[in-house]
Amino acid sequence: MPRIHLALLALSLGLCAACGSYTAPTNSQNPPPPMVQANDVSIVVGASGLTTTAFSPNPKVVSLGGSPSVTVRWVNKDITGGDYTSGSATVHNITSDNGTFTASGNLGGNATYSVALTTTGDYHYHCSIHPNMVGTITVNP
């Protein structure tokens, strides 16, 4: 009898170990869409052919609210021909009009870019790839 118990124990441990080693497949080419945050600005579908409506909302109004900075995040939602896993994304590059913040670099589909703004006022920006795309962030106290 003890041999049967040992064999069953070994079999059970082997099955548990095998079940615990599964790794879910991932899709590194198309990350899932990011969760929407309060200070998000979306780059809308078809943005490269638009002007002030390429970013939503535009202008984006945020408040420092007693904090030393407020973070604004752009999300590239300019994906056509499917959803975030099968569609084709247009690349954009968020650039400050006066160099107030560093350019985003190329943002593919669902990519995000965040900037911490520390001073009240208007921050004007555009897409350096599609200069007709323009936007404003207004930071209030």
List PLM regions with ranges:
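Extracytoplasmic copper-binding redox domains, predominantly the cupredoxin/blue-copper superfamily
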Residues: C19-P141
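Sec-dependent bacterial lipoprotein signal peptides
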Residues: M1-A17
